Amino acid sequence: MPRIIGFIFAVFLGWSAPVWAQGSLNLYCSATIEWCQPIARGFERETGIRVTLAQKSTGEMLAQLRAEARNPRGDVWWGGTGDPHVAAGEEGLTQAYESPRIAELHEWAQAQWRQTEGRTVGVYASVLGFGFNTELLTRKNLPAPACWTDLLRPEYRGEIQMANPNSSGTAYIVIATLVQMMGEDPAFEFLRRLHGSINAYPRSGTAPITAVARGETALSISFVHNAAEERAAGFPVGHAVPCEGTGYEIGSMSIIKGARNMAAAQRFYHWALSAEAQLTASQEAKKLQTMANRRVPLTDGAPNMATARIIDYDNARFGASAERRRLLARWDREVGALPR
């Protein structure tokens, strides 16, 4: 059940919407709750529009949009990996919108907007890689991984977590990245071999790096900004970008087709693309992604996408609903069904 943050709960969060608040917005959010809340608060402060917030992982939110297609309850979907947003647009669950602020964005954010004919836009980006607990590695005399192939080393057996790709956009990007780098059959052979080293497939994409920070597992396949955030919070966490190259996420935003509060949805969309909104919310949430607006500087300690070896990720192909369903079904048959 999603956590809901609405106007009536404002007193518990230490803030309140202006007494002149007009209108409302139902915000679906697939970032972490620690980031969703500042986004909701910031928009209420700026506009006086009352926000009701529902938070779920990207895959779970896509499933909810499909279930609500005939009677949409949300207005805007913010955050989470871009592939499910692309799939939602392809399925007619979201609708096109053009903000004058599109021109202020990095090319990768604009490219996603163009590719989907305006149905989704990038709001942040991050690189896929590994997180690891430095204290656990030392205690167990394990090396830090540097490459994808390192994950198959026998000493890592039972030491790695990766999210479940059926619910996690992060884990789906792992599959899509490996398919693009290795070819589909070799990628699935890699995933089958990796399965023996996986100790859990949690539903959330951030759960593996949280487990690393808590010392519950030695390694995770995660976005490197999440590892950097855990380190900044004082946990013994390091990260690495795979030496062979890697994929990346474009955290996205979409207006839900048939939104009941369309004017508020469009106003939120325009506001959320501003440098001020992105800087304030990311700082409050202590997030280290690269933000879409070019005027937002890279935060100290944030991984720099410009220095990573990033593949030419095919968002059109791997965001397509049919391709997504096919790859997930293959993962279920050939990997998820295997004993551990």
Regions found by a protein language model. Give the residues of each.
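Mature extracytoplasmic/periplasmic domains
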Residues: 256-315
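A ligand-binding cleft/hinge motif common to bilobed small-molecule-binding domains
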Residues: 83-87, 213, 218-236
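Early extracytoplasmic/lumenal segment of secretory-pathway proteins
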Residues: 22-87
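A bilobed periplasmic-binding-protein/Venus flytrap-type ligand-binding module shared by bacterial periplasmic
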Residues: 131-136, 176, 249-262, 280-283
